[in-house]
Amino acid sequence: MAEKRELATFAGGCFWCMVKPFDEQPGILKVESGYTGGHTENPTYEEVCSNTTGHREAVQITFDPDVFPYEKLLELYWQQIDPTDSGGQFTDRGESYRTAIFYHNDKQRKLAEESKKKLGESGIFKDPIATDILEAGPFYPAEEYHQDYHKKHPERYTQYRIGSGREGFLQQHWGRKHDEQ
């Protein structure tokens, strides 16, 4: 039987930290770092970091929904971010680091809204959930040196996750390391 393919797009701050947790799951066919949500075509990393393009750093995931359904992607996504921070993620500040779920169809939109509501009512966070839910638009792959950063530079990747405060936050709120599911 042929595998199904769907897209999911998530902004979760620095895209380096958003690839590995998804990449290691069954049914995930591809995870690509890039830029989306803005008004500039084919932006560069420097342009996106200038906070003038409207784009956010994001990952676009190609997945088989029969193996790893969208609902599970949402659960894993929430466990990679601080969903209450509207100004960026951890040490990375500005619009390019703001969180968002970019839906590709009405079913994804509904599931994302339900998931956000459920998280807000869970009591895990005292502040309101600030993650945007937006319609997916063009996705521009990031430069090659940003792709699979955790594989190319494992030591720097680990240092960044810890140094940025992301790793400690995730352990505090979810009680396990980022890559344990």
Swiss-Prot record:
| Ranges that cross the membrane | none
Give a yes or no for keyword Magnesium in this entry. Answer: no
Q: Keyword Oxidoreductase on this protein?
A: yes
- A Pfam match is PMSR
In the Enzyme Commission scheme, what number(s) does this protein have? 1.8.4.11
Where does the record place the catalytic residues?
Answer: 14
Give the catalytic activity. Answer: L-methionyl-[protein] + [thioredoxin]-disulfide + H2O = L-methionyl-(S)-S-oxide-[protein] + [thioredoxin]-dithiol; [thioredoxin]-disulfide + L-methionine + H2O = L-methionine (S)-S-oxide + [thioredoxin]-dithiol
Q: Per its UniProt record, what Gene3D superfamilies does this chain match?
A: Peptide methionine sulphoxide reductase MsrA (3.30.1060.10)
Name the UniProt key words of this record, in alphabetical order: Oxidoreductase
**Class of the enzyme per the UniProt entry, highest EC level:** oxidoreductase
GO terms for biological process?
A: protein modification process
Show the InterPro entries listed in the entry: Met_Sox_Rdtase_MsrA_dom, Met_Sox_Rdtase_MsrA_sf
A GO molecular function annotation here is: L-methionine:thioredoxin-disulfide S-oxidoreductase activity
Question: What family, per the record?
Answer: Belongs to the MsrA Met sulfoxide reductase family.
Say what the protein does: Has an important function as a repair enzyme for proteins that have been inactivated by oxidation. Catalyzes the reversible oxidation-reduction of methionine sulfoxide in proteins to methionine.
**Name of the protein described by the UniProt record:** Peptide methionine sulfoxide reductase MsrA
Q: Which organism is it from?
A: Bacillus licheniformis (strain ATCC 14580 / DSM 13 / JCM 2505 / CCUG 7422 / NBRC 12200 / NCIMB 9375 / NCTC 10341 / NRRL NRS-1264 / Gibson 46)
